[in-house]
Amino acid sequence: MDKVDLLSLTMEEMESLFLEIGEKKFRAKQAFQWVNKGIKQYEEMTNLSKKLIKQLSEETRITHNRIEEKFVSKIDGTVKYLFLLDDGHIIEGVLMKYKHGFTACISTQVGCAMGCQFCASTTGGLIRNLRAGEMIDQILLMQQDQGERISNIVLMGSGEPLHNYDETIRFLKIVNDPEGLNIGNRHITLSTCGLVPEIKKLGALQIPINLAISLHAPNDQLRKQTMPIAQKYTIDQLIQSCYDYLENNNRRITFEYALIEDVNDGEKEAHELSKLLKGLLCHVNLIPINPIEERTYQKSKDSQVKKFQQILKSNGIEATIRREMGTDIQGACGQLRRKYVDDQEKKEISEV
């Protein structure tokens, strides 16, 4: 039986654990504070008794990711991390530096099962879900490495957060806790390819985070070409789930739209997208895709991206073009991990 990971526990769960072993609630609070500061050795919990430390070390564990590799963009200072997990798997995270502070883009799964054709994260399929502690530790390691506090989080790394629903919700509760990283919900963005039932469940929880929907097409026929999830849920169902979400959380929804040359970047698609989103409290984030070796899709021309944006704006839809960051270090989701895994496999074959 796996030991309980202290870094994956909410404050409430930590208190329940400590009550079960005959300890006071305030001891649970102390332990919660320690693990969310990034300590990895039980002996570092200096305000806990030696007896309790011994018991915890025997009956529990603390997630301990490691920075395997780090790449710093010479263009904009973006930092790309490869994290080594306890079981040897690799995940990636990105630290982006803005005037308003540091934003961490973290992974929620090892690989991804969603199969989106323009995303490198999914080329090897899903290997496993991450625990909440493995998500938290990505942030802790980035903070320790940079010596700076991270003020914003985006769940846009490898994996589909709502496909790992329970651990993602646990992560949100932990990271928002005043005794932990204390990052406000309004500084957290969750990106999903559109798991309709889970969007409704998330909305019902009334956690006021920012929701981003990976839409990438204005109609079902086009969306099915690049996103397998569209075979399961129609765009009408997805948009309705967004209206349902807004009933519980009056937070503007972002629709991510990756522009692919001669696929979804035409004037027709821009007008169709405008009609689809009319009246919805939303914003469109236009994303010039990064070319992926395993795929044949090409990035839209800058002039076409701007024309697409202008059409949306003229139709009353707020739209921005996402700033490209870390392009010289394979900063796009999944690219660096895929290259690392491929290189390791080639190395193993050459050593046989």
From Swiss-Prot:
<feature type="domain" description="Radical SAM core">
    <location>
        <begin position="98"/>
        <end position="328"/>
    </location>
</feature>
<dbReference type="GO" id="GO:0046872">
    <property type="term" value="F:metal ion binding"/>
</dbReference>
<feature type="binding site">
    <location>
        <begin position="214"/>
        <end position="216"/>
    </location>
    <ligand>
        <name>S-adenosyl-L-methionine</name>
    </ligand>
</feature>
<keyword id="KW-0808">Transferase</keyword>
<dbReference type="GO" id="GO:0000049">
    <property type="term" value="F:tRNA binding"/>
</dbReference>
<keyword id="KW-1015">Disulfide bond</keyword>
<keyword id="KW-0408">Iron</keyword>
<keyword id="KW-0698">rRNA processing</keyword>
<dbReference type="Pfam" id="PF21016">
    <property type="entry name" value="RlmN_N"/>
</dbReference>
<keyword id="KW-0489">Methyltransferase</keyword>
<feature type="disulfide bond" description="(transient)">
    <location>
        <begin position="105"/>
        <end position="333"/>
    </location>
</feature>
<keyword id="KW-0479">Metal-binding</keyword>
<dbReference type="InterPro" id="IPR004383">
    <property type="entry name" value="rRNA_lsu_MTrfase_RlmN/Cfr"/>
</dbReference>
<keyword id="KW-0004">4Fe-4S</keyword>
<feature type="binding site">
    <location>
        <position position="112"/>
    </location>
    <ligand>
        <name>[4Fe-4S] cluster</name>
    </ligand>
</feature>
<feature type="binding site">
    <location>
        <begin position="159"/>
        <end position="160"/>
    </location>
    <ligand>
        <name>S-adenosyl-L-methionine</name>
    </ligand>
</feature>
<keyword id="KW-0411">Iron-sulfur</keyword>
<dbReference type="GO" id="GO:0030488">
    <property type="term" value="P:tRNA methylation"/>
</dbReference>
<feature type="binding site">
    <location>
        <position position="116"/>
    </location>
    <ligand>
        <name>[4Fe-4S] cluster</name>
    </ligand>
</feature>
<feature type="binding site">
    <location>
        <position position="191"/>
    </location>
    <ligand>
        <name>S-adenosyl-L-methionine</name>
    </ligand>
</feature>
<dbReference type="Pfam" id="PF04055">
    <property type="entry name" value="Radical_SAM"/>
</dbReference>
<dbReference type="InterPro" id="IPR013785">
    <property type="entry name" value="Aldolase_TIM"/>
</dbReference>
<feature type="active site" description="Proton acceptor">
    <location>
        <position position="92"/>
    </location>
</feature>
<keyword id="KW-0819">tRNA processing</keyword>
<dbReference type="InterPro" id="IPR007197">
    <property type="entry name" value="rSAM"/>
</dbReference>
<dbReference type="InterPro" id="IPR027492">
    <property type="entry name" value="RNA_MTrfase_RlmN"/>
</dbReference>
<dbReference type="GO" id="GO:0005737">
    <property type="term" value="C:cytoplasm"/>
</dbReference>
<protein>
    <recommendedName>
        <fullName>Probable dual-specificity RNA methyltransferase RlmN</fullName>
        <ecNumber>2.1.1.192</ecNumber>
    </recommendedName>
</protein>
<dbReference type="GO" id="GO:0070475">
    <property type="term" value="P:rRNA base methylation"/>
</dbReference>
<dbReference type="InterPro" id="IPR048641">
    <property type="entry name" value="RlmN_N"/>
</dbReference>
<keyword id="KW-0963">Cytoplasm</keyword>
<dbReference type="GO" id="GO:0019843">
    <property type="term" value="F:rRNA binding"/>
</dbReference>
<feature type="active site" description="S-methylcysteine intermediate">
    <location>
        <position position="333"/>
    </location>
</feature>
<feature type="binding site">
    <location>
        <position position="290"/>
    </location>
    <ligand>
        <name>S-adenosyl-L-methionine</name>
    </ligand>
</feature>
<feature type="binding site">
    <location>
        <position position="119"/>
    </location>
    <ligand>
        <name>[4Fe-4S] cluster</name>
    </ligand>
</feature>
<dbReference type="InterPro" id="IPR040072">
    <property type="entry name" value="Methyltransferase_A"/>
</dbReference>
<dbReference type="GO" id="GO:0002935">
    <property type="term" value="F:tRNA (adenine(37)-C2)-methyltransferase activity"/>
</dbReference>
<comment type="similarity">
    <text>Belongs to the radical SAM superfamily. RlmN family.</text>
</comment>
<keyword id="KW-0949">S-adenosyl-L-methionine</keyword>
<comment type="function">
    <text>Specifically methylates position 2 of adenine 2503 in 23S rRNA and position 2 of adenine 37 in tRNAs.</text>
</comment>
<dbReference type="GO" id="GO:0070040">
    <property type="term" value="F:rRNA (adenine(2503)-C2-)-methyltransferase activity"/>
</dbReference>
<dbReference type="GO" id="GO:0051539">
    <property type="term" value="F:4 iron, 4 sulfur cluster binding"/>
</dbReference>
